Amino acid sequence: GLFFRTDPKNAVQGGFEIQIASPGLYSGKHIVGSLYDAKEPMVAAGKPDGEWNTMELSCKGSSIKAKVNGKKVIDLNIDDWTEPNKNPDGSKNKFKTALKNLPRTGHFGLQYHGQPVWYRKIKIKPGG
């Protein structure tokens, strides 16, 4: 996955992640394009194994938007996550801190879940 707005000393609990693992490995709030463990993607967007996926991520204040392969997958206001370990829909998540209280700035990180993964052509533009 792509960690963002994260603390490198505590990436899993100290920031956010958009999942980019193989489409067949996970489902729901862990599938390609999800805000990991917090929000499933709006549409299925992952390509089959062996094909490159693209991602665009935009974060401004409490707004987080993401596209995978040109399809809008996340468009949310993180201030809606007001309780630790709980999503706005009432389902549980792994976060010990309410997501609205996580940093609005931080580091990027690239992660894998035990299988080979490749990244290329990474571009970062400052917001404005």
Language-model region placement:
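Carbohydrate-interacting regions of secretory-pathway proteins
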Residues: 1-128
